[in-house]
Regions:
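Short Gly/charged-rich anion-binding patches and loops
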Residues: 5, 54, 79, 179-181
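Single conserved hydrophobic/aromatic residue that forms the stacking wall/gate
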Residues: 1-6, 10
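Switch/coupling sub-region of P-loop NTPases
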Residues: 12-129, 135
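Loop/helix-junction capping segments adjacent to catalytic residues or to phosphate/diphosphate-binding pockets
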Residues: 9, 101, 143
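A structure-centric signal for secondary-structure junctions around beta-strands
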Residues: 6, 14, 143-146
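Short, low-complexity Ser/Thr-rich regulatory SLiMs
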Residues: 136-140
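NTP-binding/hydrolysis catalytic cores, primarily Walker-type P-loop NTPases
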Residues: 141-211
């Protein structure tokens, strides 16, 4: 899913894309300026380990336009948030959680693995760094499906504000809840027309039929 999303979005030839993974598994096509970074386990003497936190810092020194982190599992989550907050719009990462809301809690936990930081500060970082959360899960028939998409719109009452865009209904069908609040970046990256067509499709499909 991450490979497909990145290959479809990162088509601008003037952008430098850096991927960070345990091992190079992402299949990215049509990206000319692509740099792959991989983690390295310690040797027999327990030395020369290169973890994801170090790779994110190395990636920032390489002046990327976008950073793709295969999966965030621990304290490197703070480094990823910092990267997203320093002019690297369009960066992508993945993590394990049961919903978009649970992913926010998961990020809080991961950040606190490495630093004693006020929760309010962590939430502020997330609110400014992350635009959208996409939740993939298992459907009733066992297949993997898109379950939920939510937009982060800032802070409200000391919490990260989630704005639901799409959700899976009881009939196992993805339905539109609302439109994006902030559409500026869609226009900046030439995705606004495609977004409008998508909205027209869902509005027409979900419109009640009079009998």
């Amino acid at each position: 899913a991450l490979s497909s999303a990145a290959s479809d979005v990162y088509k601008r030839q003037d952008e430098r894309i850096i991927t960070i993974e345990d091992s190079a598994e992402l299949k990215l096509n049509g990206i000319d300026n692509l740099v792959r970074l991989e983690m390295r386990n310690a040797n027999a003497a327990g030395e020369n380990q290169v973890d994801m936190k170090e790779l994110i810092k190395a990636a920032l020194r390489s002046r990327p336009d976008r950073i793709i982190v295969g999966e965030v599992r621990g304290e490197e989550a703070l480094s990823m948030l910092n990267a997203m907050n320093t002019g690297h719009d369009g960066s992508i990462s993945t993590g394990h959680a049961n919903s978009c809301k649970d992913m926010l809690k998961r990020i809080e936990t991961m950040v606190l693995m490495g630093v004693d930081m006020p929760v309010e500060a962590i939430r502020g970082q997330m609110a400014s760094a992350i635009d959208v959360i996409i939740h993939l899960g298992r459907s009733f028939d066992g297949s993997r499906k898109l379950m939920e998409i939510s937009e982060i719109t800032g802070m409200a009452a000391s919490q990260v504000a989630l704005h639901p865009l799409f959700e899976m209904n009881e009939d196992d069908e993805l339905t539109m809840r609302s439109e994006l609040c902030d559409q500026k970046k869609l226009k900046e990256y030439g995705q606004y027309e495609a977004y409008q067509k998508l909205m027209e499709f869902f509005k027409a499909r979900d419109q009640p039929v009079e009998i």
